Amino acid sequence: MTCIAPLDIQGFTKLAPWWRTEIPTEIVLSGDGIGELFSMIAKRGAKAFFVIDSALQDQTSFARVFDQKEKFIFNATESEPRTGDVDALVEEIRASHADRNLLVGIGGGAAMDLTKATGICIANPLRAQD
């Protein structure tokens, strides 16, 4: 499949509704954000997959997240997430964690960007590189 990107904003607006997506987002900032997060997951009956910033590994308040089996630890010190990172994570989730119905990003901007891009690509048939 060949994809030709429009050269200007007017070209992008003609792509609608293809160029529209919604990402349900909830941001939790609190003294017990991790506890609240796990409570919300339990209330929803969700099966979460976590994308976690490796910089949080030594912080005890995040230990419960790092103890989860269903996780991917992203090292943002090496680079910002690339399309190849997104595609690899999508394939890992589809192959080994297909029962997960909630994607949770924890950490800084790179981990959050990777989580959002992965969520979009899981819901769509094309790769991020496409």
Residue ranges and their predicted role:
Residues M1-L102:
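ATP/NTP phosphate-donor binding region
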